[in-house]
Amino acid sequence: MSVTSQTSSSGSAAVSDCHRGIIDISGPVPGYEWEPSMTTEPVRGRVWTITDGVFRTLAIEGDTGVIAVDTFWSPGSARQYRRALQSHFPRKPVHTIIYTHDHLDHTGFGADFAPDADQILAHELTAEVIARRSSDGQLPATRTWSGERLEVSIDGAEFELIYPGPTHGTGNTALYFPNERFLYMADTVFTGPTYNIVPDFLWTSWIPNTRRLLGLDWDLYVPGHFWRLSRREFEADFELWDATAACALDALRAGVDIDNFADVKKFTYERMDEPFGSRTFRFDEFAAINVLTHMVHYQTGGWGLRDYEPYSNEPFKTTLPQRLGSPL
């Protein structure tokens, strides 16, 4: 969608009327108005995946309506997400939104996507951040859950929500479909090191907590970015991050100057290029940045209490201890 800045009678540019998240600036936000094209593809069973080529999410077809996961990253992409679902399910409105975590680029624009949804379900940790933030366009949760696991039965669809502990963002929740044997999670595992530079990756706990999901029975992983992965590709991402952390520690031991990125990059290539460089998506762009991020973590001690919450090495098992029914 093209964006045109309208001018008021006084000659000054009018402020864009789209939802603005927490961007507190005067003038239009053209990036938020842009409406990227969307691709909708079947996954397994009742589940579909929708992507703009970078961001990816799920929609679950119910008997009478649609259960949508997240809202996409901007007002424009949220509107396109809505249109994609309307095109594929013209007689089934979105009645439920499930939030994976609090970040605005995934759950920030429900007001543009499905303002009339009957319910928005989120982990209580996610819901608390959203309520306190009061971001323009991010709708508050109407139903919350707590703990690690919740079986969900909504409108004929059944799946499980799993909060493995602190990983990235707040309350980041995986969706597990035991009958279809696949898993979805936003912003933790995907091909390459692309976005793990985002500040609130909790380096102490995110790898052991996310690894717990390997205890479940699944062979397909749908990430919140880029393309689907096999179970082996999911495991390979941890190998990359274990090597990244080890490289950062070795760099500190070797006296590499944390303030000299050229030296950090040189050290990263010496240690990681041979095993990972040619087979890792966007390695050249992000590998050294992530080594630097780990170095800062080790040097500063991390994110305080958030980075030192207890975590578990106990794998999840395919059991369903708690159930959430739906009034729908």
Curated annotation (Swiss-Prot):
What else is noted?
A: Unlike other known O-demethylases, it does not require oxygen or electron donors.
What is this enzyme's class at the first EC digit?
A: hydrolase
Gene3D superfamilies documented for this protein: Ribonuclease Z/Hydroxyacylglutathione hydrolase-like (3.60.15.10)
Superkingdom of origin organism = Bacteria
Protein's name according to its UniProt entry: 2,4-dinitroanisole O-demethylase subunit alpha
Q: What does this protein do?
A: Involved in the degradation of 2,4-dinitroanisole (DNAN), an insensitive munition ingredient used in explosive formulations as a replacement for 2,4,6-trinitrotoluene (TNT). Catalyzes the removal of the methyl group from 2,4-dinitroanisole (DNAN) to yield 2,4-dinitrophenol (2,4-DNP) and methanol.
Which EC number(s) does the record attach to this protein? 3.3.2.14
Cofactor (UniProt): Zn(2+)
Record's cofactor remark: Binds 2 Zn(2+) ions per subunit.
The reactions it catalyses are: 2,4-dinitroanisole + H2O = 2,4-dinitrophenol + methanol + H(+)
The Swiss-Prot or TrEMBL record describes its family as follows: Belongs to the metallo-beta-lactamase superfamily.
Residues of the propeptide region, as annotated, are: 1-9
The UniProt gene name for this protein comes to dnhA
Q: Give binding positions for Zn(2+) 2.
A: 105, 225, 247
Say if the entry is tagged with keyword Metal-binding.
yes
One Pfam family for this entry, by name?
Lactamase_B
